[in-house]
């Protein structure tokens, strides 16, 4: 029986540094792939519910649904997918695409979505930035970023998803009136997010400039959120609406 080797933190740090030093590594990514074994149900789910898994490149995400005219929500980094599945169950009038690079998370998400018989959820193993670039402008109703890697070390700040360059791309793809919803339990990243987002002229802070949004009841609690609460961390939600181009 083969065993999947899981990288230590030190090994990940070394890999990140080596990637940054490669001359051909021009694109800064916001994620690192981490290996982990699949359980039996996850392995079978990848085959049984493969119709829920999109293969990159995918083009316009809306075309992969039975009702492409329904509002589209894109979640970037859905972890194990429980909250994404719950949202798709609660909102059959919307289409959901989850983008994740952690294979066990993808497998668990399609297992739960498949068992629930969901038709309005698809998942994708890809770099979210590349996926967004290939989407038509003004085509997404909501982009969700829940408890992303805060990249705590200063030299890794460029990897944070919420920076001006990446938010410009998000704005281009959001339809007018569409929203960007982020949540984090890491206070320094929350302050960073607010500083970036409050200074985007095309976005309006629905909680008022300088404020975080009251925790929405409709956002299911995630595993990372529970861990943050158990550690005594404050949970910050930010919802920004596109008001211009």
UniProtKB/Swiss-Prot annotation:
<feature type="binding site">
    <location>
        <begin position="222"/>
        <end position="225"/>
    </location>
    <ligand>
        <name>substrate</name>
    </ligand>
</feature>
<dbReference type="GO" id="GO:0043527">
    <property type="term" value="C:tRNA methyltransferase complex"/>
</dbReference>
<dbReference type="InterPro" id="IPR029063">
    <property type="entry name" value="SAM-dependent_MTases_sf"/>
</dbReference>
<feature type="binding site">
    <location>
        <position position="75"/>
    </location>
    <ligand>
        <name>S-adenosyl-L-methionine</name>
    </ligand>
</feature>
<feature type="binding site">
    <location>
        <position position="149"/>
    </location>
    <ligand>
        <name>S-adenosyl-L-methionine</name>
    </ligand>
</feature>
<keyword id="KW-0819">tRNA processing</keyword>
<feature type="binding site">
    <location>
        <position position="100"/>
    </location>
    <ligand>
        <name>S-adenosyl-L-methionine</name>
    </ligand>
</feature>
<comment type="similarity">
    <text>Belongs to the class I-like SAM-binding methyltransferase superfamily. TrmB family.</text>
</comment>
<protein>
    <recommendedName>
        <fullName>tRNA (guanine-N(7)-)-methyltransferase</fullName>
        <ecNumber>2.1.1.33</ecNumber>
    </recommendedName>
</protein>
<keyword id="KW-0949">S-adenosyl-L-methionine</keyword>
<feature type="binding site">
    <location>
        <position position="127"/>
    </location>
    <ligand>
        <name>S-adenosyl-L-methionine</name>
    </ligand>
</feature>
<dbReference type="InterPro" id="IPR003358">
    <property type="entry name" value="tRNA_(Gua-N-7)_MeTrfase_Trmb"/>
</dbReference>
<dbReference type="Pfam" id="PF02390">
    <property type="entry name" value="Methyltransf_4"/>
</dbReference>
<feature type="active site">
    <location>
        <position position="149"/>
    </location>
</feature>
<keyword id="KW-0808">Transferase</keyword>
<feature type="binding site">
    <location>
        <position position="153"/>
    </location>
    <ligand>
        <name>substrate</name>
    </ligand>
</feature>
<dbReference type="GO" id="GO:0008176">
    <property type="term" value="F:tRNA (guanine(46)-N7)-methyltransferase activity"/>
</dbReference>
<comment type="function">
    <text>Catalyzes the formation of N(7)-methylguanine at position 46 (m7G46) in tRNA.</text>
</comment>
<comment type="pathway">
    <text>tRNA modification; N(7)-methylguanine-tRNA biosynthesis.</text>
</comment>
<keyword id="KW-0489">Methyltransferase</keyword>
<feature type="binding site">
    <location>
        <position position="185"/>
    </location>
    <ligand>
        <name>substrate</name>
    </ligand>
</feature>
<dbReference type="InterPro" id="IPR055361">
    <property type="entry name" value="tRNA_methyltr_TrmB_bact"/>
</dbReference>
């Amino acid at each position: 029986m083969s065993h999947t080797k899981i990288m230590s933190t030190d090994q990940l740090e070394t890999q990140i540094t080596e990637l940054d030093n490669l001359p051909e590594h021009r694109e800064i990514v916001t994620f690192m792939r981490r290996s982990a074994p699949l359980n039996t149900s996850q392995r079978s789910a990848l085959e049984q519910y493969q119709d829920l898994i999109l293969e990159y490149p995918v083009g316009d995400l809306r075309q992969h649904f039975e009702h492409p005219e329904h509002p589209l929500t894109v979640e970037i980094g859905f972890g194990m997918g429980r909250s994404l599945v719950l949202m798709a169950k609660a909102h059959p009038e919307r289409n959901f695409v989850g983008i994740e690079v952690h294979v066990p998370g993808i497998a668990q998400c399609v297992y739960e979505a498949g068992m629930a018989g969901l038709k309005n959820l698809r998942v994708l193993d890809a770099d979210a930035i590349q996926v967004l670039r290939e989407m038509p402008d003004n085509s997404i109703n909501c982009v969700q970023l829940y408890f992303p890697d805060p990249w705590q070390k200063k030299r890794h700040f460029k990897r944070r998803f919420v920076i001006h360059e990446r938010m410009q791309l998000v704005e281009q793809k959001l339809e007018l009136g569409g929203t960007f919803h982020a949540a984090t339990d890491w206070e320094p990243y929350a302050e960073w997010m607010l500083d970036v987002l409050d200074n985007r002229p095309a976005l309006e802070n629905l909680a008022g400039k300088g404020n975080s949004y009251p925790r929405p009841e409709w956002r299911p609690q995630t595993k990372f959120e529970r861990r943050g609460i158990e550690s005594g961390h404050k949970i910050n939600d930010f919802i920004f609406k596109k008001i211009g181009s």
